[in-house]
């Protein structure tokens, strides 16, 4: 089964992201707006038990973190993804690194760039046009995230929560 690890931002930020995703992201119906902490990975039922155990420990050892969105940006020319850029805080980087160690060991496909996708799989012209419009807008959003989520992918391609982990162990 395929799994992933994400942070879900507040409803306010999700609503803003969805206002663009409805039109510019073909994955809109498959997963809510999120910040990917670890790329999707395959695991068996036995392996996922070890993963969950490790994630519980990671959550206990971590603290709630600040998510600060500062601008719209893009991964162009590598690919035509438009996103809300999150400041790469030490807490975010540390959480992502921990999610690539132990039972989750592996190498990320790309270096960690914290972001919330608002558009993808656009033609080059549409990408350029939409990004140009978004860059003219001010975006400044800050919130505290106190949990992360292990998701799994259903047969129809959509993602759902397998388990939620409170940062700081909920203490």
Swiss-Prot record:
Keywords: Hydrolase. A motif (HXTX 1) lies at residues 34-37. GO terms for molecular function: hydrolase activity, acting on ester bonds. The keyword Mitochondrion does not apply. The active site is at 34 (proton donor), 115 (proton acceptor). Its EC number is 3.1.-.-. It is an enzyme of class 3 (hydrolase). It comes from the Bacteria. The keyword DNA-binding does not apply. A motif (HXTX 2) lies at residues 115-118. Belongs to the 2H phosphoesterase superfamily. YjcG family. This is Putative phosphoesterase RBAM_011910. It comes from Bacillus velezensis (strain DSM 23117 / BGSC 10A6 / LMG 26770 / FZB42).
